Regions:
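Conserved SAM-binding loop and adjacent beta-strand
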Residues: 121-123, 390-402
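Small/polar loops that bind or transfer phosphate-bearing groups
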Residues: 121, 198-199, 418
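Short glycine/proline-rich turn/loop motifs
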Residues: 107-115, 159-166, 379-392
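Conserved beta-strand signature within the Rossmann-like core of class I S-adenosyl-L-methionine
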Residues: 193-197
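Mobile active-site "lid"/loop adjacent to the S-adenosyl-L-methionine
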Residues: 148-177, 181, 190-192, 203
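Conserved proline-anchored active-site loop of SAM-dependent methyltransferases
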Residues: 138-156, 211, 410, 416-431
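Basic, amphipathic juxtamembrane/active-site segments
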Residues: 155-171, 431-449
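Accessory, often C-terminal, charged low-complexity segments
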Residues: 2-100, 109-112, 117-118, 133-141, ...
Length: 577
């Protein structure tokens, strides 16, 4: 045995000739050196395997060493491009190894103001994502996340401790943390789904390569540069940092980015040297048309008489422009503003030229990769939180609602997920946009409750804006809990998990079980018998979740076309292992 180990060591240290077919001197000096090294190592591994097979057929240790060699070969041949980082185990990983995650409801927090059902989940987002895999695999249309930026200034907590700048594994911990969550996020995305990830300079380059590996470089849609503030302090080492990034990745080619469509009542009825064009008013109309709705979009421009003018809303109050200051400057510079005098004042319009002279086509405007003032900045987010809560310092570095709205309008999204929910901006944006365009979008937010953030900030914000703005929305508050994994048999474990099934059923179907008749849960044959006698209820029912020992008549499927799922196996197939 000692001889075998010595030979293995010698081979691995380079004591054996490289490959039987040697490369020429010229070949070894040009081309892919990493590939050459892999081939050389692979050749060594092959010779080690051959020796072990011939060394001792009867030696059981040789078989064990062969399995080690297979692992080495797999590692050598695996990654050809990408990040190399140390994988780290989190405390939640151990929690999930020793326990089964479940959900419990805080019923006191239920909000019913009509509209769609939404969910707020309190707990570690890794556990929450594993639960969402059971209910929403392939169903999420849009994910927005604002993960910790890993600044080293107490923004990234790993295993209950802040990761500071002196931690030698700082970036590895962040990447290991994100990799697990992004892999789960990918499994939740629909085929036409998209994910937006807010980042700053610290981890943006690493996250880009990580997303290429997980989601595919071919699914990279672009990178938005968002101007989060104008000016600011002089504390940065070299530049005053005014921007952050939003990475955009799709799940597959089925994702469709919705360009802005410009429609004007008058049509292409005007003409200049550039051709036929529509005149689209630059003053905002419809919802959110007032100055206070977007302060950064209220600024003066000069009319043809050289006088300063400000936008006016349709009701005569101070308004806002449709575009930001930088875009307005571009329009002026490129002579794309058309002026008309109405009621004694000059009114500016954007010129939208016809496509190839075909007046039947509608102009589609591509979204610009740099967001200037159009979507607001962190100051706007801070001001909004102060207004909602009536006090300052509610949450640091929140994103403005208008930024999330801008992302939402470019995707066909019914189900929206944010598993770094923070102050709840994503939920707020979804409800606001629904109220403006009559949409039926639904959101799931996930956040931990560190310093009471989930209860005191995320939930409280959603509750307050629903009440104040009269948003048509429902909200359930769930919490991640754990059931210990024991040596108990199937029936004992099934009985325990059935106590938590209602929450998963509600989450999957987007319902409140008490008031919704489209879904039924029957855990005993007595309950099944009562349900089967209730013909009116069966006529409304679409899905029945039944316990493992419950028997239903064939008519349930044949006559009523009801889908039947056996629980807890439907959600916890691992119970059968």
């Amino acid at each position: 045995m000692r001889t075998v180990l010595v030979v293995v060591a010698v081979f691995l240290l380079g004591g054996v000739a490289m490959a039987k077919e040697k490369k020429t001197v010229q070949d070894s000096r040009i081309g892919n050196l990493s590939k050459l090294r892999r081939e050389q190592l692979s050749a060594k591994v092959s010779e080690i395997r051959s020796y072990l097979r011939e060394a001792s057929v009867a030696d059981t240790n040789a078989e064990r060493l062969l399995s080690f060699v297979a692992e080495l070969e797999k590692e050598v041949r695996s990654r050809k491009y990408g990040l190399i980082f140390e994988e780290h185990k989190e405390r939640v990983d151990i929690e999930l190894e020793e326990n089964i995650p479940v959900l419990t409801e805080n019923k006191k927090c239920f909000i019913d103001n009509g509209g769609e059902m939404n969910f707020l989940i309190e707990g570690d987002n890794l556990a929450a994502l594993k639960l969402l895999e059971k209910t929403h695999r392939g169903k999420i249309d849009l994910i927005y996340i604002d993960p910790p930026y890993n600044t080293g200034n107490k923004d990234f907590i790993y295993n209950d401790s802040f990761v500071d700048k002196t931690d030698g594994y700082r970036h590895s911990k962040w990447l290991s943390f994100m990799e697990k969550r992004l892999k789960l996020a990918k499994s939740l995305m629909s085929s036409s789904g998209v994910i937006f990830i807010s980042l700053n300079d610290i981890e943006q380059p690493n996250c880009r390569v990580l997303c290429d590996a997980i989601l595919g470089e071919c699914n990279f849609c672009g990178q938005i540069i968002w101007r989060k503030k104008a000016g600011g302090g002089q504390t940065d080492d070299f530049f005053v940092t005014e921007h952050e990034y939003v990475l955009v990745y799709r799940k597959t080619k089925a994702f469709e980015w919705i360009d802005d469509t410009i429609v004007a009542d008058a049509g292409f009825n005007k003409e200049d040297d550039g051709g036929k064009f529509k005149a689209v008013k630059l003053e905002k109309w419809g919802s959110s048309a007032h100055k206070e709705d977007r302060l950064t979009m209220w600024f003066p421009i000069k009319d043809p008489a050289g006088k300063k003018m400000y936008p006016i809303a349709p009701d005569g109050l101070p308004g806002r422009w449709r575009v930001g200051q930088k875009r307005m400057q571009d329009l002026e510079k490129n002579k794309l503003i058309y002026w008309e005098k109405k009621d004694g004042r000059w009114v500016p319009y954007e010129k939208i030229y016809s496509i190839d002279g075909d007046l039947s086509k509608i102009k589609k405007v591509k979204c610009r990769s740099i967001f200037y003032d159009e979507v607001g900045g962190t100051g706007d987010a801070t001001d909004m939180l102060t207004e909602i809560f009536g006090k300052k310092d509610i949450f640091s570095n929140a994103k403005p609602v208008s930024l999330i709205e801008e992302l939402l309008v470019h995707a066909k999204a019914n189900f929206i997920l944010d598993f770094f929910a923070g102050s709840g901006t994503t939920g707020h944006a979804v409800m606001k946009l629904n109220s403006e365009d009559g949409g039926k979008r639904k959101f799931i937010l996930v956040t931990n409750n560190e310093n009471g953030i989930c209860e005191k900030v995320t939930y409280e914000r959603l509750k307050r804006v629903i009440n104040k703005e009269k948003y048509a929305a429902k909200l359930k508050y769930f919490k991640v809990d754990y059931v210990p994994i024991t040596e108990a048999g199937y029936w004992e474990r099934a009985e325990e998990l059935l106590k938590y099934i209602r929450e998963l059923v509600e989450l999957e179907n987007g319902i409140d079980f008490v008031h919704d008749k489209s879904v039924a849960i029957v855990l005993t044959n007595k309950e099944a018998e009562a349900l089967q006698k209730d013909k009116k209820r069966l006529a409304l029912c679409k899905t029945i979740y039944k316990g493992p020992n419950v028997l239903l008549t064939p008519e349930i499927k044949t006559e009523y076309n009801i889908d039947v799922k056996t629980i807890p196996d439907y959600y916890y197939p691992e119970l059968e292992d």
